[in-house]
Amino acid sequence: MAELQVISTSRLRTAVRVSGDPDGIPVLLVHGNVSSSRFFDELMGLLPPLWYVLAPDLRGFGDSERLPVDARRGVGDYAEDLHSLVEAMGLAGTPVHLLGWSLGGGVAMQYAIDHPAQLASLTLVAPVSPYGFGGTKDAEGTPCFPDYAGSGGGTANPEFVKRLADRDAGQDSDFSPRNVMSAFYFKPPFHLEEERESAYVASMLQTAVGEDNYPGDLIPSANWPTVAPGKRGILNSLAAGNFNTVDIVDIDPKPPILWIRGDSDQIVSDTSLFDLGFLGQIGAVPGWPGVDIFPPQPMLAQTRAVLERYQTNGGRYEEEVIEDAGHSPHIEQPEAFLEAFVSSVRRNS
């Protein structure tokens, strides 16, 4: 059973779930957007007991301090927070195995760029594209517009944001966090048992809401869909123009990378239901300027192209696709996920 601790680092008070043997193989788990370390509860209980597993809540999530996010630095705030935790836990001189899920995948890539020698391996679970979320086209991440319109804080669904702020734990709307989790975090008809589902929803509702956190601010744009990324908050930290981890191809040393994704992910895919390019194409967002100007973002193709460059430059990576899973394969298909992840850590320890 993981123990929830609160660690005062040089940057903030960080809540972190801790399990296993402090003298064992160190493993860091970094959660995704609108979630917390609680989403790793089952996984932590299934990992080898001789591993030393740490799963922090990022700033503004879970039980960690609600500090603002400077999106002009991409996910730099989160990556530096993570490094301060590693230092506070006495692991700065020990290579760790770092896993990042979704937003956490972006944080993990930035951490690898900043501290490559500190990683024994890197596992990316349904990660954000190295070119960010929204506003780009083609495998090279070409911007659809110079101001990266179509990404950032202004692209969040306002009804979901309102219900998150209102701490709506019910299910009377498609935009209630509980229903959003069931419909998009997982591949329907997957459902958690009620107690665990409610615990996850409660952790979603701990998300700090506002321009400094979720979703962030916005800048009006003359380009479709009339919003461009702002400078504050979570969605802007992932927005094209602010976020870019392509430099991972040049890091030295190059830890081995395991890329794990579900075969039915609706959030990070080449046809994402959260990408305005795809939503415009299917008629869900009016005024779409067409496939030549704003096609669906090829998120998987972008990630694969960057990882291929990583491999060409002397690194190595594996792509593992988990069948019958959506955006959360570690929850939906824990046995298949464990087999891939545990094998990778053991090979590289």
Predicted regions and their residues:
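Hydrophobic beta-strand anchors of alpha/beta hydrolase catalytic cores
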Residues: V27-L29, V53, L99, I257, ...
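Alpha/beta-hydrolase
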Residues: T142-Q302
